[in-house]
Amino acid sequence: MQNQKIRIRLKAFDYRLIDKSAIEIVETAKRTGAVVKGPVPLPTRIERFDVLRSPHVNKTSRDQFEIRTHLRLMDIIDPTDKTVDALMKLDLPAGVDVEIKL
């Protein structure tokens, strides 16, 4: 796997989980001899929802809710077979979504 790059994109609602997972991936990749760029924090996506408090009247009275989606981007440059095997065996928390592109 020479002159290749693995791009890993992490997505989660909790920034503590995503940072912990990113550190775990970086340590695993470095331990197997690969070069890691990142984790790079991408802009947090904030979705806001306005909901009426009352079912009938009082349109001006509303509750506001938001969901924050945190993103991290990492590049693993020149990965070995050992690196790929170690990353596949890695056990990450359930709240972290992982996208891998070769």
Curated annotation (Swiss-Prot):
Record keyword Ribonucleoprotein present: yes
List the Pfam families hit by this protein, alphabetically. Answer: Ribosomal_S10 (PF00338)
Q: What is the lineage of its organism?
A: Bacteria, Pseudomonadati, Pseudomonadota, Betaproteobacteria, Nitrosomonadales
State the UniProt keywords alphabetically.
Ribonucleoprotein, Ribosomal protein
Q: Which GO terms describe its cellular component?
A: ribonucleoprotein complex; ribosome
The protein's name is Small ribosomal subunit protein uS10
Record organism: Nitrosomonas europaea (strain ATCC 19718 / CIP 103999 / KCTC 2705 / NBRC 14298)
Quaternary arrangement and interactors, per the entry? Answer: Part of the 30S ribosomal subunit.
GO-annotated molecular function = structural constituent of ribosome; tRNA binding
- What family, per the record? Belongs to the universal ribosomal protein uS10 family.
> One GO BP annotation here?
translation
Function according to Swiss-Prot or TrEMBL: Involved in the binding of tRNA to the ribosomes.
